[in-house]
Amino acid sequence: MRALYPGSFDPLTLGHLDLIERGCALFGEVVVAVLSNPAKTSTFTLQQRFNQIHVATAHCKGVSVICFEGLTVSCARHNQVDLILRGLRAMSDFEYELQIAHTNRSLAPDFETIFLATAAHHSFLSSSMVKEVARFGGNIDHMVPEVVAQDLHRLFN
C-alpha cells in the first residue's frame, strides 16, 4: 500500500519523522507531500523543506518526497496512493483533522484518511513551537532532525 502524508512541514519535526517511519512499517510506502501554499508565509522555502525531508528520511526504505499545490485529494489521485495519513497529538488536532478528512471524503469518496496517534514523547512538538524555541536560542536537538536543526541555527543565529 501507498500512503500520502501531506503537510507544510515548516519545519519537519521528529514527530513528523516518527509518523513517516511508522507509516512505512504499516503501509510499505509513504509519499511525503510538501505543501506549497502561497497564502501562507513560510519560514523555509518549498525547496528547503523538500531537501530537509529528503535528507532526514534517507534511511527510510519506501519514502518518496514530492511538492504539491492544491487539493490533497488531487495530489493523492495523481500519485496513485491508497490512503491519506495524518497524525494526531491531541483532541484539538482530532477535531481539525476530522473536518479535513470529511471534506476530502466528500471530494473523493475512494480515499480513506488514517489517523495515527503521535508517540507520547513527541506529542508536545509543533513546527511553530520549534521555531519559537530556536528563535530564542533554546536547544532544539531533541525536537527536529539534525539537518533541520542546522538550518534553524543558521537562520536564527
Swiss-Prot record:
GO biological process: coenzyme A biosynthetic process
GO MF entries: ATP binding; pantetheine-phosphate adenylyltransferase activity
Catalytic activity: (R)-4'-phosphopantetheine + ATP + H(+) = 3'-dephospho-CoA + diphosphate
First and last residue of the signal peptide: none
SUPFAM superfamilies for the chain: Nucleotidylyl transferase
Site (Transition state stabilizer): H16
Pathway(s) where this gene product acts: Cofactor biosynthesis; coenzyme A biosynthesis; CoA from (R)-pantothenate: step 4/5
Pfam family, one: CTP_transf_like
UniProt-listed Enzyme Commission number(s): 2.7.7.3
Listed cofactors: Mg(2+)
Class in the EC hierarchy, top level: transferase
Primary location: cytoplasm
Cellular component GO terms held in the UniProt record: cytoplasm
Family: Belongs to the bacterial CoaD family.
Function as written in the Swiss-Prot or TrEMBL entry: Reversibly transfers an adenylyl group from ATP to 4'-phosphopantetheine, yielding dephospho-CoA (dPCoA) and pyrophosphate.
Protein name (Swiss-Prot/TrEMBL): Phosphopantetheine adenylyltransferase
Underlying gene: coaD
